[in-house]
């Protein structure tokens, strides 16, 4: 299994969901939109995901599962797949990172790393 696949690019956009959050109860909800761009010459399939979510107190949560949002999408060459999901933290700032396990046309599994990205309510410096 390859450690990294440079032909897959990941873009992440995050947003604080104020209407679902309750700071008094230490509940801060964030949405994220992820676009997976397949820059390779073959179709790939996203098989599973693994997230490490860390809040600003250092509390960590691992999330693993098949596919994303109930799907194991095929992503054709030079195409992209976008999905949205969310998470809740006990602090107003946190970080997510992880990886996708992918499968190429030859049946070879490889890992696509997802670089750390910040979850934060607006105007927080932490």
Swiss-Prot record:
Q: What biological-process GO terms show up in the record?
A: error-free translesion synthesis
Q: Report the residue ranges that make up the ApaG domain in this protein.
A: 2-126
Q: What InterPro entries does its record include?
A: ApaG_domain (IPR007474), ApaG_sf (IPR036767), Uncharacterised_ApaG (IPR023065)
PANTHER family, alphabetically? F-BOX ONLY PROTEIN 3, POLYMERASE DELTA-INTERACTING PROTEIN 2
Which HAMAP family would you find in this protein's record?
ApaG
- Mind telling me which NCBIfam families this protein's record contains? PRK05461.1
Q: What is this protein called?
A: Protein ApaG
Instruction: State the species of origin.
Output: Vibrio parahaemolyticus serotype O3:K6 (strain RIMD 2210633)
């Amino acid at each position: 299994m390859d450690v990294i696949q440079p032909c897959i690019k990941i873009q992440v956009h995050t947003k604080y969901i104020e209407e679902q959050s309750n700071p008094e109860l230490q509940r801060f909800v964030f949405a994220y939109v992820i676009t997976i761009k397949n820059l390779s010459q073959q179709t790939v399939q996203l098989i599973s995901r693994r997230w490490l979510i860390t809040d600003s107190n250092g509390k960590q949560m691992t999330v693993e599962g098949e596919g994303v949002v109930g799907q194991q999408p095929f992503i054709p060459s030079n195409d992209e797949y976008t999905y949205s999901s969310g998470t809740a933290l006990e602090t107003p700032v946190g970080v997510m990172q992880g990886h996708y396990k992918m499968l190429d046309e030859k049946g070879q599994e490889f890992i696509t790393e997802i670089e750390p990205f910040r979850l934060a309510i607006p105007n927080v410096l932490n």
